[in-house]
Amino acid sequence: MKEAIIEWKDFSFRYETQQEPTLQGIDLTIYKGEKVLIVGPSGSGKSTLGQCLNGIIPNIYKGHTYGEFLIKGQAAFDMSIYDKSHLVSTVLQDTDGQFIGLSVAEDLAFALENDVTALDEMKGRVYKWAEKLDLLPLLDQRPQDLSGGQKQRVSLAGVLIDESPILLFDEPLANLDPKSGQDIIELIDQIHKEEGTTTLIIEHRLEDVLHCPVDRIVLINDGRILFNGSPDQLLATDLLTQNGIREPLYLTTLRQLGVDLVKEEQLADLDNLSISKGQVQLRTELVKETPELQSLFRLEDVSFSYDDRPILKSLHLDIKKGEKIAIVGKNGAGKSTLAKALSSFIQTEGRYLWEGQDIKGDSVAERAERVGYVLQNPNQMISTNMIFDEVALGLRLRGVDEQEIETRVYETLKICGLYEFRNWPISALSFGQKKRVTIASILVLGAEIILLDEPTAGQDQKNYTEIMEFLEELHQQGHTIVMITHDMQLMLDYSDRALVMVDGELIADTDPASLLSNPELLVKANLKETSIFNLAKKLDVDPLALTAFYKERREGCKLN
């Protein structure tokens, strides 16, 4: 008989500061040794459920509870945070916020030191988990100096060392390149099997998590459980798209091909789908006019070093008017440093030419009138309380006349679909709307290039679509879009040029489909092909032709 380890029985929770409950009537049992994926759109309540589990609620965030919530048969909210920490270990989305020690070894030992573990036992357990997670060469390094994938391994080792029976992962893929994300999912699966833990994963990137099997998926929206069952059962419905979660790309493509998925029993595993070779016929030549574009911003022999360590190495890049460019590569490849160089946040060697004119001497303010840099988190860019004031801030700092400010701000707000909210407080906006405000604040300065760092990271399908369709509108109006991204589907859907960076060098400049069909290049850059390419192998069709078919359906291109 299965043993219940976590139980919510008609459980509701309301934050002290809110009038309506965030969780409503939750009935959910997690059994010992299960691996469960929890999905839902932004604001659905899934993170609140996780915070109830690990003790952040009620120890940090207070509120009112109704119903029962049990961990191993005990009332969870009656436990001390110390006792609960020995039952539930959490790996946070922001790994940097989880590090305590000055070295990897110190960080791994932290929980054991708190438990006054004997020194010999402490050293043995640190060595055991460092060896298991391939961290032995890194024990003397600072956690903050590691790559994204290495940081995730350190965070995971830091909680595994306590050997808690329940592991909770809060969006473990949010800041990782595709290959590192795949490696972490495989590592979580390995630990789950070897240690027999009960594993809960909260994540937007459903297809990436399903790279390894899960026992169940729980879909939450508006604080209620809408689905609780197997991945195959969920994928056979349209609940994902109805609730703002992106379904696996291979399923979208199969639907476009007219394949009847209702009869399929193993939708979560592409390899086991019953579709056969030769079932689909595609013509292979994609005809799409590519107009000759004019050079806008050219970099020549740009290099940058930090503490004598080269970060950018002799980069040559020509950004042309009206392009949509994706900059991709593994964590630490130099993508963000390149963005800082484009924005004049750092001083580098080399030449910067804007429509043929040397602009290397631009100040940050002058460069912002050419290249608008939008950070991943809009809350890190927002400086005022009201929408109008935020968009007007850059003009006011430049001493522009107030009447001209009003004219330019109103015009920009209309372009960004924010005019009706002009007198609203920013706190009342959704994440996607806040992103629009930050883009408006750079557009009002006249920026022709919009440079975005991970424009959709951590966003559900609704926010993702809202942000990207808005960028498409700006592109249609003549803006050049440059995006740093780890999302291969975003690159495929929304860019026409891919720049691949590895160790500070630009190793490829190609179109997205060609990149995704080049295994050697993908390995070098820690990227991975989309599931369209795996589907093409299964159907025995040209992956470029299948990708072209998918994009035709999406963009209205013509196939011949």
Swiss-Prot record:
List the SUPFAM superfamilies: P-loop containing nucleoside triphosphate hydrolases
Q: Where does ATP 1 bind?
A: G40, P41, S42, G43, S44, G45, K46, S47
Membrane-protein topology: Peripheral membrane protein
The compartments listed are: Cell membrane
Q: Which InterPro entries match?
A: AAA+_ATPase, ABC_Co_transporter, ABC_transporter-like_ATP-bd, ABC_transporter-like_CS, ABC_transpr_CbiO/EcfA_su, ECF_ABC_transporter_ATP-bd, P-loop_NTPase
Q: Name one GO cellular component term.
A: ATP-binding cassette (ABC) transporter complex
Its EC number(s): 7.-.-.-
**Domain of life the protein comes from:** Bacteria
Q: Main localization of the protein?
A: membrane
An MF annotation (GO) of this entry = ATP binding
Family to which the UniProt record says this protein belongs: Belongs to the ABC transporter superfamily.
* Protein name, as recorded: Putative ABC transporter ATP-binding protein spr0430
The major lineage groups are: Bacteria, Bacillati, Bacillota, Bacilli, Lactobacillales
